[in-house]
Amino acid sequence: MERASERRTASALFAGFRALGLFSNDIPHVVRFSALKRRFYVTTCVGKSFHTYDVQKLSLVAVSNSVPQDICCMAADGRLVFAAYGNVFSAFARNKEIVHTFKGHKAEIHFLQPFGDHIISVDTDGILIIWHIYSEEEYLQLTFDKSVFKISAILHPSTYLNKILLGSEQGSLQLWNVKSNKLLYTFPGWKVGVTALQQAPAVDVVAIGLMSGQVIIHNIKFNETLMKFRQDWGPITSISFRTDGHPVMAAGSPCGHIGLWDLEDKKLINQMRNAHSTAIAGLTFLHREPLLVTNGADNALRIWIFDGPTGEGRLLRFRMGHSAPLTNIRYYGQNGQQILSASQDGTLQSFSTVHEKFNKSLGHGLINKKRVKRKGLQNTMSVRLPPITKFAAEEARESDWDGIIACHQGKLSCSTWNYQKSTIGAYFLKPKELKKDDITATAVDITSCGNFAVIGLSSGTVDVYNMQSGIHRGSFGKDQAHKGSVRGVAVDGLNQLTVTTGSEGLLKFWNFKNKILIHSVSLSSSPNIMLLHRDSGILGLALDDFSISVLDIETRKIVREFSGHQGQINDMAFSPDGRWLISAAMDCSIRTWDLPSGCLIDCFLLDSAPLNVSMSPTGDFLATSHVDHLGIYLWSNISLYSVVSLRPLPADYVPSIVMLPGTCQTQDVEVSEETVEPSDELIEYDSPEQLNEQLVTLSLLPESRWKNLLNLDVIKKKNKPKEPPKVPKSAPFFIPTIPGLVPRYAAPEQNNDPQQSKVVNLGVLAQKSDFCLKLEEGLVNNKYDTALNLLKESGPSGIETELRSLSPDCGGSIEVMQSFLKMIGMMLDRKRDFELAQAYLALFLKLHLKMLPSEPVLLEEITNLSSQVEENWTHLQSLFNQSMCILNYLKSALL
């Protein structure tokens, strides 16, 4: 067991599958045009890989292979996508596979610029290297003093052959000829750091974004400033120009706002406020189309269209996830295809495990929607609800009224949500008599019928509300259900029993209809989380002492207790059949407990502590969310498609760290057989031929080999044809020929041997078979295994022929018959192949019973064998009678 636990390198039950809800980060996107397909594609960075979307439908086209570190910058040309990670960058073909890798930098790369058949890379130490793409060789290397000229932007001006323009944090710009390695000109700048460089539609004109929020339109050929614009939102993060006939420039800001400037009138024509909730990482106008692509660190990719008379962009398509870490996730529905998630950004979203086009956002909760509509507030941050801490969902009546209820951080009232309408519901559920600000909702649940919501408060009160009308339907207990804060509420599947638990360490069972206390259980420690599996009636409790207690709500007793976590337990989940309890804790571990055996069967560590776990209703995936992560991570259940050893793990088992899955489906890794050591847990168990010498053991032969041995004559009689087979009519025109290049007729065969006899030689038929020979050998050495194996390999007719040939009349002998009886005795002594011994003995007696009394040797042998058979059957009969007695008692007893 210890060797098996040492060899296990990952989870035995779960394998990383993919990540959901990740679309963008703070790395600027890259837009490419495919001349073959005549389409635009946008590439966004997601951690250690990047996504490629079709702009037309914003559908995911490809996900790249992962790189060892997080991607720090990207670039693309017409054929390849370049991504830098650390001090290395790679070229990807077909948006997926790495075809070239460039190594030479000693510091982190933060700029990449395609340059024909070359690629320019710049690191944080001021080293600029020009590479030949296909040979992966260095063409030129330039070194810049960071204190004098620290590169902050790079651009290849249009029509400027072999020239690049570099911007610096000190404010100056330099124009270099990279072929001759010469500095052509130094622009003094505007004494403010350069943050962005963008080629204008006009030749020789470049837009320069500054730290001060200014955008300078500058002619680099004549070193002349054409116009200046200024934004009050901080440094310019990115710049883009429309090329569809409208002289408009867009500039991004760290506030998430976008300014639209008219280059003819030299004025601001529009503002796109709150285009993103974080800084604009990148914005790009598609060539000759009124479409603007933006992305930001808020995990959103948006496409805006400018088709209105005011010139303001409206949102056309988007892919959006959570912009802040998640607070709660739960599978929604019974098909296991939707996952509801709440985040610290205040949104409630639904992610599809099938395709991203089925994702939808239920939006932010607003305190007063009518006030917002009446006053037309643009900035709704002041009226938004706090983040959702816990929620419960039920789809039974989702088409009739709201089916989701959520409690918010620091709020007394609980909000309802409608999944079908994808919006917040009509009611805020809270007791009317409570007006204290320090009381908050701490636990929620919805009945399986979808009609009632149960809400627990920090004051110890537990209330019931009608989901259709929002009316208060009663409270549990006289004044309050618990003396401390309510930590969990749950209702069984038939609305008969309500279970609540409080911080004072009590677990209470209530009648759901009349709200009367039925039973109370004192816990060893204060509970932290409570979870009910309605189908099995099993209740899981995570306590503050890092242990887990499992109760049966029918008997109201603790049936299992688990310990092993070294940190606070954040969440739990039951498998659909109720056999497994999966727990996630702050010790970065996810443990799987087997409830029938009461053992830990799986455990693995993660590099980030898991906050939530949820098991799919179909049992195929486990969904997790983690600290400081924006995505939902899916783990496939290995036991559904392969054999998994569920042996209990030892108490000193040390789990290994497992990497979080990426955004693409995990591919199988080919490993050479030499490096794979067989694990004890993966070795298939070979059952011995006999578990114990005292146990009667049957053979593994099918019944057709021995069950019908006594009825062979009846079977042959039934299978005998009623009429002899008809001889086909002769066909004289078919004359036999000899094959060859020239066919010749075959001459009839002539029998020229006058000595050939037509009398059958009975001596040939009387030859002894291998079975008889092995029986004769067994009479000498007392070994019958070979003879028994010959019988096992024969069919029913062959067995009858062999046993019939044992008699002296058919070529056998008395000694051979005696040896056969000894073989049967050996089988009964060893208690192996028990049914074969009975069948072979019965057939032997049927064939030779008449001659046994006349032979003293055989009579003595059969007498001993008879007592042996009777002894075995007497023992078996007593066991059969005992088993039948117990079964009859269980059938008739009133338990």
From Swiss-Prot:
Major place of residence: nucleus
Start and stop residues of the WD repeats: 30-63, 72-101, 110-143, 152-186, 193-230, 237-272, 277-320, 327-361, 389-428, 441-475, 486-522, 527-562, 564-605, 607-645
Gene: WDR36
Localization, UniProt: Nucleus, Nucleolus
Impact noted for substituting P431R: In GLC1G; uncertain significance
Coiled coil stretches, renumbered: none
Disorder association: Glaucoma 1, open angle, G: A form of primary open angle glaucoma (POAG). POAG is characterized by a specific pattern of optic nerve and visual field defects. The angle of the anterior chamber of the eye is open, and usually the intraocular pressure is increased. However, glaucoma can occur at any intraocular pressure. The disease is generally asymptomatic until the late stages, by which time significant and irreversible optic nerve damage has already taken place.
Native source species: Homo sapiens
Name of the molecule in the record: WD repeat-containing protein 36
Known tissue expression: Expressed in heart, placenta, liver, skeletal muscle, kidney and pancreas. In ocular tissues, strong expression in iris, sclera, ciliary muscle, ciliary body, retina and optic nerve.
Extra remark beyond the main annotation: Depletion of WDR36 mRNA in cultured cells causes apoptotic cell death and consistently associates with a reduced 21S rRNA and delay of 18S rRNA maturation.
